[in-house]
Amino acid sequence: MNGGLRVPRTPRHGTPLYEPIPESPGRVFALQTRSVSELDWDSNVVWQFAVPVNLGVGDLDRGVIFHHDVVRRANGNTLVLCSVRIQVPAISPSVLTDDCIIEVTPAGEIIWQWFTFQHFEEFGFTTEARQLIAEARNGGDWAHANAVSEIPPNHHSDPAFTPGNLLVSYRELSTMIIIDKATGAIVWKAGPHDNLTIGQHQPEVLPLDLPGAGNVLTFDNGGEAGYPTQFRSFSRVAEFDPLIGPRPPREPLA
């Protein structure tokens, strides 16, 4: 190896690839607000899916966008994080940005979808949190999902960790959840009121071939997030047993 550039992030015609997400073997996902494309290392598009006009949840969902994360499942289907603009009076009198997950076949058919607002009661929000969410701060982006991953084979006996279930991260809620892929129910969560992570990103269940297999590894951002807002002035990488939960963060050494 001589250190030369093998693959530029920007194609020759100069259009930036927004949110390039590595995928193996030898592929990368380019996620834009209106489409997701799978590219080979020569920037050839080998698969593409355009944003649907709506997802059938109401008159306001014509603003569907893709964001943050794309996952290729073992069965060849693709999971995409997206958001819709909806109004849910039971949550807020204002228009909200709600996060959803769709599963798309290689042929471009949506065969599964999951909306956060439909599971609002499963998060266990306090009365205070409900009032703050109703105020629709941040333009109504009340939960702000930033990652989704598929649970890999693991040694846990808890059915929440059945391979194929989905681990999802919500920045604004400082919460991670597991969705039962078969039923859609939230079957595990860390947050929203233990304040052990703040604005975390990219949680993953470690696979069997890595040290700590079955643990959750996440980047715990810190900063401001939560209802009510919590603040921490530093970030950390946290690995924890999901049946015990993350430990409270310690102040970094000076």
Regions found by a protein language model. Give the residues of each.
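Histidine-/acidic-rich catalytic cores in large beta-rich domains
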Residues: M1-A254
